[in-house]
Amino acid sequence: MDRRTFLQAVGSTSAVAVAGCAGQSESEPPESVGEWADDGSIEFGLPPFQDAEQLNEQYAPVFEWLADGFDGVDTVKGVQTTSYSATVESVVNGHTEMANLSPIISVLAAEDGVNPLVINWSHGADSYYSYIATHAESDIDALGDIAGSTVAMVDPLSSSGGLFPRYMLTQAGLDAGTVNSQPDDFDIQWAGGHDASLAALQNGHVDAAAYGDFQHPTDDDSIVKVAESDPIPFDPLVAKPNTPDAIQQALIERLLNTPESALEAHRIDRFGEVEEGTYDPVRGVAEEMGVEIETLDPESESDDDSTTNSTSETNESTTNASTSTNESDT
């Protein structure tokens, strides 16, 4: 199955509830962001790293800022997918004009022409970490102790909640499986989100959990960190393939000038430019783990209904949308 066939296969099982497939013809490329938007609406794909209400609140001020910046754009709508692969499918096939992609997905999708626009900066950095944690009273003191345990993870295509934890466990000498198979040395319970992965640990359903450092509790001494990854570049905001350079640049400039009030509600410091080589660390780990988008079988990605390959539209984030909630990382 080649890359394009895989993406079409995901689409055939997706039931993508998104308008906006028509787009512009190749002979008449759009000359403005308003023309590029579908009927005045930019649809923005979001992976399920938090619940829909939180995502809607978090992205609303950024969506408002984008919508207000371009003639012909009436709304920017958040479309939350229920799996990471469905997020990339939606933007690669033009069902959504923009998306927030996990670092690993952005690396894979670049070969399909998905264009990174900006990268998130938070706490003065453009990178974050993957944590593997356990209960304070657990016998798990090091990664090697996870053998024989059950570990909650986010999604096979989550960087901090899937790829990097599996890589760390591999480096510790354990078989960590593939994106399509369970490991030999421990079991993975795919939770579908960073909050759900932590909750599985807190509720005693698993022995350990992997998630982004932003999810780690600061007021719960019963949860302790076992290991953390090397720095992972934050997720980028991207535009669909064949977006003209002038439109990409207009979107970049608008995002780089996002006002402080919107950034505070979005829980980041700022958006920054994507430099050459930014995602090389992610690409390197993906290569070592043998992860390619065409190797991902959408039927075996997860046994959890929360990560089936479909999308559902969040409450529309328009120019009068509300704000607040957690920072987002994948």
Regions found by a protein language model. Give the residues of each.
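Hydrophobic alpha-helical segments
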Residues: 1-330
